[in-house]
Amino acid sequence: MTSDQNIKVDDVKLDGVCLFLAAYLSWARQFRVFATRMPLIAYRGHACGTWKLVPSLCRNRESYNIRLLKQYEDEVIREFRNRFKLSDYTDIEVLAYARHHGAPTRLLDWSSNPFVGLWFAVSDKTHDSVSGVIFQLIAGDSDLVSPRMGNFKLEHAENCGCKKPIHIFSSPSKIERTERQQSIFTIASLNDGCVIKPLDEVGLPQQKMPVRKFLVPAALKLELRRTLAELGLDAYGIYGSADAFGETLSALFDLSDFNVSSEIISCAKTHSPTAE
């Protein structure tokens, strides 16, 4: 390597996407855990920054009786168990399987990988005109969130000795997409109507839910999506199905709205995008 190929960080020019990624990773790494598989930190991306952290079963159902929501949940479990031969799955495993396939459940799906969270915030081009958001949940020493390992059961959500309203657990390894998405789930208790509240609003004023968020500018979504695809984070990388591979190819060949950012920012003069 010749001397003119040896460059320093300050010599590198960053465009808007690289600046965003550097700021986002720096923000995410403010909280880190080592040497454990306990689900202590999780990321979830929303294509629209105004969407609430409410599970699909409970959206727009604030007036529903909790008993009715439980009946819906039982029906989802029964239908998936019978239709897809999941007799050896526990109830919570069936719910995780159903959630990965789009069924309404009271699970919120997260990832231990901050870039998977980012992918979900930018993957849907129909929302490119609005800013997205990535949520970070830090469960370490929270009075409201209980990290669970091993044999977590559905009934623990309501009848657990910890008395916490939110439980967080890793997606069961037998579910195909678990490894691809590095999946984590949260489940809210049916007690006191916690399940119909946005997760970041659960608790009392003196017990704040440990959730932060990082905004994704609408102007960067397209280029972020293509940059993540170059790193293997695309529909096929996330879902692994033939349909997802077709979606990935369609996105790869579609250049109709592609416009590379011309903004160049010195690495020595960077500033952080909006984080909360």
What is the predicted role of each segment?
Residues M1-E276:
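Catalytic-core elements of nucleic-acid end-processing and repair enzymes
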